Curated annotation (Swiss-Prot):
The keyword Transmembrane helix does not apply. SUPFAM superfamilies: Ribosomal protein S5 domain 2-like. It comes from Rhodopirellula baltica (strain DSM 10527 / NCIMB 13988 / SH1). GO terms for biological process: L-histidine biosynthetic process. Its EC number is 4.2.1.19. Pathway: Amino-acid biosynthesis; L-histidine biosynthesis; L-histidine from 5-phospho-alpha-D-ribose 1-diphosphate: step 6/9. It is an enzyme of class 4 (lyase). Keywords: Amino-acid biosynthesis, Cytoplasm, Histidine biosynthesis, Lyase. Belongs to the imidazoleglycerol-phosphate dehydratase family. This is Imidazoleglycerol-phosphate dehydratase.
Length: 202
């Protein structure tokens, strides 16, 4: 995977190319939700649009994958690329809030998402979707996308569905709540430019 940083350390562009996918992705943590998402998977593009808007990050994704097989590799590799980009954009984590959490209602759904951008991976996910498909999209890929993100962003991510029944609504709720938690965690802390750890390093 190749990448480059702009003059701002919180902007990263990278390319991930494998035998299954070819992904170009750029992220700006100090954005406004701008950018274009083109994964070849309509439902995933919709979720990425929500992520960019609610996290207030600029996000551009151009992906070509083996969609003739299924959506798995493309969704997974976009999660990997996005997590990697966020990790690199955060650098040593100095001056960020580090933690974020958000409980978000959407119609009959309620989801809590909590994030620690502390440089270590942990993932706990309890947001089951009863239906195996959301349209043509495998519903299990919602969880897999976020696990792939968390591994590569080197973060703790905990997602909990309190209640909800509609698969589309649950997915939206998960993406919006997690986006809002990420927004809080990566924001610059106006009270401190230090690394947010008593160890002095993350």
């Amino acid at each position: 995977m190749t990448s480059s940083n702009s003059n701002s350390s919180r902007e990263v562009s990278l390319e991930r190319k494998t035998g299954e996918t070819d992904i170009k992705l750029s992220v700006n943590l100090d954005g406004s939700g701008a950018g274009k998402r083109d994964s070849g998977i309509g439902f995933l593009d919709h979720m990425l649009d929500l992520l960019a808007k609610h996290a207030l990050i600029d996000l551009t994704v151009e992906a070509k994958g083996d969609l003739h097989v299924d959506d798995h590799h493309t969704a997974e590799d976009i999660g990997i690329a996005l997590g990697t980009a966020v990790d690199r954009a955060l650098g040593d984590r100095a001056g960020v809030r580090r933690y974020g959490h958000f409980t978000l209602p959407m119609d009959e759904c309620l989801v809590t998402s909590a994030v620690d951008m502390g440089g270590r991976y942990a993932f706990e996910y309890n947001a089951p979707i009863a239906a195996s498909k959301i349209g043509t999209f495998d519903s299990e890929l919602v969880e897999h996308f976020w696990q792939s993100f968390a591994v590569n962003a080197k973060c703790n991510l905990h997602v909990l569905l309190h209640h909800g029944s509609n698969g589309h609504h649950i997915s939206e709720c998960v993406f919006k709540a997690t986006a809002r938690a990420i927004r809080m965690a990566v924001e610059s802390d106006p009270r401190s430019d230090a690394i947010p750890s008593t160890k002095g390093v993350l």
